[in-house]
Amino acid sequence: MRCIWLAVLALLPSAAPAQNVCRPSELVTRFGDWKALSIPIRLSAPSQDITPKTRDGQLAASMRLLIAAPNPGAKPWSLAIRDRDGHLLSQLERSDFPSASSTLWTGRLTGSMVTVTLRGGDADTFVEVRGASASGPPNSDQNGFSISGATAQWRDFYTGAPHSHAPAPPNRRDPAEAVGIFVDDTLAPAAAGPPGTRTSWCCTGVMIGRNLYLTNWHCAGPKRLWDGEVRGNAVIDLAWENGPIRRQFSVSEVVAQNEDLDFAILRIQPAAGADGGVRTTFPVQISTAPISPGQSIYMIHHAQCQPKLISDNCHVQSASRAAWTDPLGGAGAKTEITHDCDTEPGASGAPIFDPQGRLIALHHLGHQKAASPMCPIDNVNKAVKMSAISDFIRASVDPKYQALVVELGW
């Protein structure tokens, strides 16, 4: 399955001179294949089956649908989305489409087929499924981009597969429940295909407040810009783990961001149609204490867009590394650490925890496989210290950042 792709960074717009930034090729991780659709749903034909396939012809393991209501009509209605067996997966309401130009993405819908049914409305009501992002089974190929040995030593958080078959210890469940996959679908650059082509990707992130999600700045995707399109098409799934509970969110606001520290803090809200499966999130604890080389750590992530994984029995290698935008350390600030937790594309934004389950760093870069004058080859993974992120936000005079300091108790 080809749910992962490695972007050629030379083809992407850059927010900083490429020669001054160490950015390996794993920054953008493909997740799902876009299929343009034009499926009308009216009272005269209120129910339609949707069966998108991946680029290589596989049936989808899950999908997201892009839905519009060009004419919502005058009467209330709802749109029920059910799986092959008739289980209700999501329900959208007329109020989710405030205007005829409104479109929205559903959350992740499991299964190879869904049925979309219009309930209510009037003769003028016209809803349209405009596209689907179809994802095949999770990719478990061992690509070997940023791992220490011949095979990755991460394992499924809940089952322990494929290595030890021992689940993670119970005291790590609370931190794990705050970790989720970030998935986005936006219009692709013109060079990527015909008009209307979309591109999708995944990252990892973690809840640091009741409705605040922390991930990497570069997880804004190919445009490297947290604009309205990226925000509007994103979904965050805190239960991408084959579990029974749906915990999916959309992004309402980018509260804080910084390229040098490669972080973005997103304010989130329950995704349309997903309210019934969402409860208040329980954020992680954060530690800004000094980090020491050799310190024991673990990382929870979605490498290769797989269900929730854990990389443990790993350690901090260096506690003093310059920022990715200052690879030679000219600015003097040592805002990053290096570590040996196995990672792959999709783990960008993954939280790194100390043995007490406190968030100490945010993973953002893997091994530097290709050398450049500014960036020599290395075999270390990199993460941004939470102390650096906290210091940056607390030092800002921006009223929005000062309000964030109060909200987070920093």
How would you describe each model-predicted region?
Residues 13-15:
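N-terminal signal peptide c-region/cleavage motif recognized by signal peptidases
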Residues 19-172, 177-180, 248-252, 392, ...:
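Domain-level representation of secreted and single-pass membrane ectodomains enriched
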Residues 89, 214, 360-361:
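Generic structural signal for well-ordered beta-strand positions
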Residues 110, 120, 130-194, 198-200, ...:
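Serine endopeptidase catalytic core focused on the charge-relay Asp
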